[in-house]
Amino acid sequence: MSTLPGTLHSAHNGTWQVAEHGCQVLAWQADDKPVIWFDAEHADESEAVIRGGIPLCAPWFGHGPNNDQDPQHGLARRTDFEVTVADPFRVVGVAETASIGIRHEVVMTNTALKMMLTLTNHDQKPRVVEGMWHTYLRVADAAQARVRGVRGASWHNFATGDKGSFDANELAVAPDTDTVIQGVGPALALLDSAWGRQIHVETTGCPSAVVWNPRSSSTHADNPTAQAWRDFVCVETGACKDNAVIVAPHSDLTMSTRISVETL
């Protein structure tokens, strides 16, 4: 029987929540509506992986830039972090995976969720690293959702194989959306029109983004995540694939993401 999500640090009656496992954000909201999607009834996605929330994908994303790394999406989300908690609600987790030190800082306030990731190369040779927040953003209806702020960036939809660059500034969340975006700007917004709001995702040091939703045009939803496709859109930010970073020995890669909500 799964013990995930394990030890939790909570505030505001559980509407703000971080798990020690993966130093993974599970909940945050600024008003009466949740901003993060987390399936507490089916918390174990697979062995040692929490379903939903904001999984931390590091020191590689997917199977790495050369498609030769396992497990998928790195070791961070499968690792129990050493965590300290401060007030106001601030969680700092540290871990060591594959000679890469990981420090993840989470700060929650009434107006924003802020995260900062630092990856340190403890190896004696340069390392290619990736880091992404695989953020599950809660929406009223993903079929009506759009992501704004993509104009000029390049894209590759790994569900369809299509690729190109954005002329328009918005991406609709259609079936078969698994779109890696490179050269994206520092300000994205998820338009959650059914709930009359937009969720801002502002970043530093994050040239990559991924927009993903499990709705498929051809296959049946056969797991709890796919069955809940209408309830979330993943807007993932960080550095991955073509923007993987070579980190010198004893050097760092640092990036940050800030999430906030505004009425449409």
Protein language model features and the residues they cover:
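Beta-strand-rich N-terminal accessory domains
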Residues: 1-51, 186-206, 249-264
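Glycine-rich active-site loops that engage anionic ligands at enzyme catalytic sites
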Residues: 46-49, 57, 192-234
